[in-house]
Amino acid sequence: MRHPRLIPLVAVAHGSRDPRAAATVTGLLAAVTARASRRGLPALDVRAAFLDHCAPSLPQVLGSVDNGPAAVVPLLLTAAYHSKADIPAQLAAAAAATPGLEVASAGTLGPHPLLTAALERRLRDAGVAVDDAGVRATTSVVLAAAGSSDPAANATIAALAARWAFERGWRAVVPAYASAAGPRPGEAVLALRDGGAARVVVATYLLAPGYFADKIRTAALGAGAAAVSGVLGAAPEVADVVLDRYLAAADQSIVAGATYPVCMSVAPQLGICAGGETHGERMHGAPPRRQ
């Protein structure tokens, strides 16, 4: 299989004051390196950057890349403020600090078909018999995300919930949000139980542990959830999505200042390009991503 030239993969995470979050990013990137080796990319240079609370920053990491471009992969599950504003601003700052910087920018990790497989992996880890069709048919799921002030991001979560229920035959899958939108996870659990659901479980749609993950778990268990899954973390499916995003972006890497059909409108003059639809998404029949 032909792969694009091996430019560095710079994975940019939100960052947190909770040390568990940075440790989880480290574990995920170790999984990415291992999966890359299995896919014929044994020398892949993988680096971590953070938008807030942790070091190094994205401009710092990009400034340390020598001899060529880098592919920036947001470790974010939805396209919202961080991907639409924070990352472009930091890319612009990096370009100003490093003349001639070449950057290929990938899309966010979600939506992607493999992420529902990762969610089911974590539910399985929590004791839910996700491989039993009879259990799925009698189990209602709360898909608990961080939540956003961007309605489009929350709509993405709602669409994921509907698609997951349809494709896998859960009794119901409903979205819930730990902040900025409703219903909250505890409210969603109570609503399902009041509606006759005999068994309600909560699937935590977060990459790393921290304040939101703890909040979701406490509220869900307090409302009577039978199980609450852990964060996605270094699940193999997540590592594969990171690689999919990287390969799509790296294959479209360009020289700074050049034009390209998929250059992001936020900063085409910087040579910042968005990764296109991946081979995995085409194979799974996923709808095209909107930039």
Name the predicted role of every residue range:
Residues 1-291:
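Active-site-proximal alpha-helix that buttresses catalytic centers in soluble enzyme cores
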